[in-house]
From Swiss-Prot:
NAD listed as a keyword: yes
Domain of life: Bacteria
Species assigned in the record: Chlorobium luteolum (strain DSM 273 / BCRC 81028 / 2530) (Pelodictyon luteolum)
Protein name as annotated: tRNA uridine 5-carboxymethylaminomethyl modification enzyme MnmG
SUPFAM superfamilies for this protein: FAD/NAD(P)-binding domain
Residues reported in the UniProt entry to bind FAD: 8-13
Sequence segments annotated as region (Disordered): 199-227
């Protein structure tokens, strides 16, 4: 018997298995192909808007994704630097093959982890408690808990034009059959979603004189808090071209053979990552769309055509690609395709990712209706932490919306109606100024340390940084900038004359002012600050905390109000039907979702503020 069995070794499964085994428990990771561990089946990249923040949070909690991309990245960029700090998001292109090799090596190094090449086709449970899993080989493996991270494999069906093939992630990988049906028999509700991927081309066939080069940053910050620097790393460029009206006309000639428009695809696709044919259909007035050409690694000629996700017939794909600048002679390596797959609407899970119907069974990743490697990895890590915590009799990790993007992700899953693949955006987080990529360690590392996934040394580095931030803030409070120095600085910004000096903590709030400018203008202040810490991340956080102090205080007040509702627990078998005053829709949604707290209940679609007022009175009794 294993403590925990993990089904699937994608981005969710690898993080789940590592979290369990590093907690000191025995774990079995079952996957159809051990050479496809953490495979990047779509874009060869980690991070991006909101996703970069999630990757940093995974690292702070003790996950592996950030270390993996630091080790195998081929281009690193910080996005949205022209916007405020809440929007700054790290992103990296990955060497796809090297990333898989890194993750497989990480799994193989874990002494508590066994790997098995097989397929989970069913679960065994007795009286609502998980007992084990059934494998395609016919074997029964018993376990105290199981985490299902099946990705797009559940009854996967791939579409290219009017042709369709059973496939789990690519045409070469078989789907998982039987598991969906097994779970439905156990009382779960399943649905159908769709996603897609662009074609891959031979980068030697691109005319680089006709496309725009996009280089990486010279000194990008690492994703992992344990990576000292990425300075001097070899990087590859990406390139930008555009679709044209001619491209769109060519692609339209294939719409009568498109599975999207002929009704062959039944699953609902991601709203914010539409196919090129969907973009043409939805935005007919747009003469063109950005297309990004992204290399897939140092040792391959494959290039990913970002922005050209499609399931049109292969001949139409080739003609469409060759109508764009720089791609006139392009060679196709792999056609783009759409894939339909089963998922389980996530109102059926708790915020710990344990299912409500079967104890000790957890769902993580695309089985919950999410899209994206980072969203999947975050869920896998959380499920692994909580499965281990339950066995070890530790408190479960429940992240609030004000704690982390991961908290927002899980709360949205368990409270909102899932009608399409869920993708995280900064706009999804009402506390996004608090949930920046740079402070993920301060927000979350203590949780990872309590779970046994973050070392004492890493936790001490975080505490040292926190102490330095506090001491530097105190220094800015007691150090004043003389009027003549301040006047000289602000006159360069075209600001009114300064009649008197100011504390540095106040002066830094002025437009165009920065900690670096103030340090360079006041040598004694610079010397005192550097004697506290030379950590540039600590300096950056001090500047952000001081500049946005008023906004951060408002976010904290909002978070406190929400926390009061989240502190009011609702019994799991609460009888909503007998409460007078609740709307009929409210009763229906409360019964199906079974919220854990009044705060969760308030965020369920269809539960009105008046319903919450009625509940508050009854629960308060």
């Amino acid at each position: 018997m294993y403590d925990v069995i993990v089904a699937g070794a994608g981005h969710a499964g690898t993080e789940a298995a590592l979290a369990v085994s590093r907690s000191g428990l025995s774990c079995l990771l079952v996957t159809t192909d051990l050479n496809a561990v953490a495979r990047m089946s779509c874009n060869p990249a980690i991070g991006g808007v909101a996703k970069g923040q999630i990757t940093r949070e995974i690292d702070a909690l003790g996950g592996e994704m950030a270390k993996a991309i630091d080790s195998t990245g081929i281009q690193f960029r910080m996005l949205n630097l022209s916007k405020g700090p809440a929007m700054h998001s790290p992103r990296a292109q990955a060497d796809r093959v090297a990333y898989t090799a890194y993750m497989k090596r990480a799994l193989e190094e874990e002494v508590n982890l066994d790997l098995l090449q097989d397929t989970v086709t069913g679960i065994e449970q007795r009286e609502g408690i998980l007992r084990g899993v059934r494998l395609l080989s016919g074997r029964l493996v018993t376990g105290r808990a199981a985490i299902l991270t099946c990705g797009t494999f559940l009854n996967g069906l791939i579409h290219i034009g009017m042709d369709h093939y059973p496939g789990g992630r690519t045409i070469a990988e078989p789907p998982v059959t039987g598991l969906t049906e097994n779970l439905i028999l156990a009382g779960f509700e399943a649905g159908r979603l769709k996603t897609g991927t662009p074609p891959r081309i031979d980068r030697r066939s691109v005319d680089y004189s006709r496309v725009e080069e996009q280089k990486g940053d010279e000194n990008p910050p690492p994703f992992s808090f344990s990576t000292p620097t990425l300075k001097g790393r070899a990087q590859l460029s990406c390139y930008v071209t555009h679709s044209s009206e001619r491209t769109h006309e060519i692609l339209k000639t294939g719409f009568d053979r498109s599975p999207l428009f002929t009704g062959k695809v039944q699953g609902i696709g991601p709203r914010y990552c539409p196919s090129i044919e969907d973009k043409i259909f939805r935005f007919p007035d747009r003469p063109g769309h950005h297309i990004f050409l992204e290399p897939e690694g140092f040792e391959t000629n494959e290039m990913y055509v970002n922005g050209f996700s499609t399931s049109l017939p292969e001949d139409i794909q080739i003609d469409g690609l060759r109508s764009m600048k720089g791609l006139e002679e392009v060679k196709l390596i792999r056609a783009g395709y759409a894939i339909e797959y089963d998922y389980f609407p996530p109102y059926q899970i708790h915020s710990t990712l344990e299912t409500k119907r079967i104890r000790n069974l957890y769902f993580a990743g695309q089985i919950n209706g999410t899209s994206g490697y980072e969203e999947a990895a975050a869920q896998g890590l959380l499920a692994g932490i909580n499965a281990a915590a339950d066995i070890l009799k530790r408190p479960a990790l429940r992240l609030k919306r004000s704690d982390a993007y991961i908290g927002v992700l899980v709360d949205d899953l368990v409270t909102k109606e899932m009608k399409e693949p869920y993708r995280m955006f900064t706009s999804s987080a009402e506390h996004r100024l608090m949930l920046r990529h740079d402070n993920a360690d301060i927000r979350l590392m203590h949780f990872g340390h309590q779970s046994g996934l973050v070392s004492d040394a890493a936790m001490e580095r975080c505490r040292t940084k926190m102490r330095a931030i506090g001491e530097i803030k105190a220094l800015t409070e007691k150090t004043a900038i003389p009027a003549e120095v301040l006047d000289s600085l602000i006159s360069k910004q075209g600001q009114p004359h300064a009649a008197s000096g100011q504390k540095i903590s106040a002066a830094i709030k002025r437009p165009g002012m920065s900690l670096e400018i103030l340090m360079n203008s006041l040598p004694p202040f610079r010397e005192a600050l550097l004697s506290i810490s030379t950590d540039k991340e600590a300096h950056q956080q001090v500047e952000i905390d001081l500049k946005y102090e008023g906004y951060l205080k408002r976010e904290l007040l909002t978070a406190d109000k929400i926390a009061r509702l989240d502190a009011l627990q609702i019994p799991s078998e609460y009888n909503y039907s007998c409460i007078k005053g609740l709307s009929s829709e409210g009763v229906e949604k409360l019964i199906s979702h079974r919220p854990e707290t009044l705060g969760q209940a308030s965020r369920i679609s269809g539960v009105s503020p008046s319903d919450i007022s009625v509940l508050m009175v009854h629960i308060g009794r």
